[in-house]
Structure formats: structure tokens, C-alpha cells
Amino acid sequence: MSDRPAPPRFSVVICVYTEERWGDILAAVDSVRKQSLAPLETLLVVDHNERLLDRLTEEFADARRTGEVRVLANAGPRGLSAGRNTGIAAARGDVVAFLDDDAVAEHDWLHHLAAGYTDPAVVAVGGRTLPAWASGRRPVWFPEEFDWVVGCTYRGLPPGRVRVRNVLGGNASFRRSAFDAAGGFATGIGRDGDRRPLGCEETELCIRLANAVPGAVLLIDDRAVIHHKVPAVRERFAYFRTRVYAEGLSKALVAQSVGAGKGLESERRYTSRVLPAGVLRGVRDTLLGRPGGAGRAGAIVTGVALAAGGYALGTLRARRGGSPAFSWGPITPEGVPQETAAPEQPEKKGAAA
């Protein structure tokens, strides 16, 4: 008889908000239901869209009766964070995994996520997210170092199964007990459909979780692969500019919550090592006559400038009390965190982006 512990039971949460992604939603659910390690349940959380809620309820009527797929309405304010909190509150599994509604998981996705939890110190495991470009190929100017702009794993992250500060939200999992210790995703930060391309809600949560659980370990395992669709509009430089600027605003909110030391720890290495190397590669490719080198180098420089500008403005707003209010707290049965305002952080030295 094997002494190997049984894998954890997974609740997979997919937050949805628009019928325009109907085919993508069905594909995402299908990829979860075909996993080599079957999940306990798939939870579809609908973000304040009654028509989509009714349509999904009808589509998965049979699966709902068996408990394999459940369709829920977001019980909190509009936005991705509250939707995730609704899913967490309803989850019955030992581990809660999150998959984007426009992504497809590979067959062994949950199997590889589960492998990380053999260590009881591990509280979160993320995976590798590959872009599926609408045009069929990466835009020649688009640097791999900025794949986070389209919700994907970017160049500069270490390979293999490695310890990290934070996982990436569209391909992530957490022990259910982690939310009891640290609370849920902060509302007031993160995405609200397509209207607000902010992010960093998972970064803020992961730092808060590490502070709440002594010795907590967070991992990324690059064998846990999903494929994330990148629509044509997000292949354009206009979206790139908007998204990197919004990331700067988001980082300012994270620094306000957890302090600039932890909030910008990984970003300092990224901007001082990864991005300069990317610029040099772009220049080299240009000199060698390879297509797109100058564009990639220029995009990196532009991205740094815009993100820094967003961070500076977000920091100024926070000091003046004009930044968006966000809060977190214990997950209630309704899926809404009890209001806990982000604490004021003393100004720290060395907080430059």
C-alpha cells in the first residue's frame, strides 16, 4: 500500500461577466471537466449579468444537479475580486483554483498544481500561462518581458517549480484555509469587466497571506499550463500603453496596503535586470537585421515610463486621499469580505519604483 497522501480536492472558480465570451466560457469549463485529476466541482460566478446567469443555469442544469458545476451570482460589488470571493465562500474543496473565463487548461493542470501541496507549508501554487494570439502569432513588436500585459507568464520568471512572492491570478490555487487566515481578495482593486484594466489584486493578497501565515510558501510550477486567449484589440499598442499605465496605478495601491518594501520587491529586480536585458536583445536584433528588435526595445522603454508615471500619480493620489478605497476581511457565507480598510502605511525609504 502506498504511503503517498491523497491529492487535495479542488474547487475550480471561473468568474464570468459577458455573453460575448460564451464560447470561451464553455471551452474553459470543458477543459476543467476533462482534467486527469478530476475536480470536486466547478463554480461559475456571474458578475451582475442576469441574462448570462440564466443562460448558464440552463446550460449546466444537469451538471448542477450532480454538483459537478454550480452557477452563482456575484454576491458582492461588481468586479473580479468580489466574484472570486463569492466562489471562495461557496467552495467545498480543500484547495480553490482560479481559471480565467477566456482560458483553456491543459489535461494535467490540476495534477501539477496538486503536487505542490504535498508540503504542508505551501499555501498557494500557480502555473504557466501561455498566450493564444488572435492573429495566430505574437505581434513582432510585443516583448515577452511584458506578457503580463495580456495576463500571461512573462520572460524573467524562473523556470520549474520555484518559490515566488505571488502567483498570477488567472492560473492560481490557494488552500481554502489560507483565506481564513488572510481574508479574501481586496475589493476596490482589480478588474471590473473591460472597463478598468487594473490588476495586482492577487499580488496584494499573496503578500498579505505571507504576513498572516508564518513560514508560508507560495510556488509556481511551470508544468501547470493554461492557454489564455488574447483578442485582437489587446494585440495593439494602444492597449499595451493603457494596461502598463494602469499597472503603475495598481502597484501604488498595493504599496499603500502592504508597504513599498514588499509591494515592489519583485519589481525592482524586474526593472533593474530583466528589462535592461530585453532592451539590449532588441538592439542586438536590430543590428543583426532581425524584424521587430527596435519595436520591442522601444516598447520596453515606453512601458517602463508609463508604469512609472502611473505609480507616481497613484502614490500622489493616495497621499492626498484620492485613491480608490479598497478593503478585505474574512469571507462570509455570502461571499462578501467584512469591511477592513487598508491600513495607512508610514513612508519608507527606498520606495522608488
Predicted regions and their residues:
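Conserved donor NDP-sugar-binding/catalytic core segment of glycosyltransferases
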Residues: 108-141
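Short aromatic/hydrophobic "clamp" motif used to bind/position activated sugar donors
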Residues: 96
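Short, flexible, basic/aromatic active-site loop/helix in glycosyltransferases
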Residues: 127, 143-164
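A short, conserved alpha-helix in the catalytic core of glycosyltransferases
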Residues: 169-174, 178-182, 189-224
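N-proximal low-complexity "stem/linker" segments adjacent to membrane-targeting elements
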Residues: 1-31
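Glycine-rich, basic loop-to-helix element that forms the pyrophosphate-binding segment
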Residues: 74-91
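Active-site-adjacent helix/loop segment of glycosyltransferases
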Residues: 216-303, 307
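Acidic donor-binding segment of Leloir-type glycosyltransferases
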Residues: 29-73
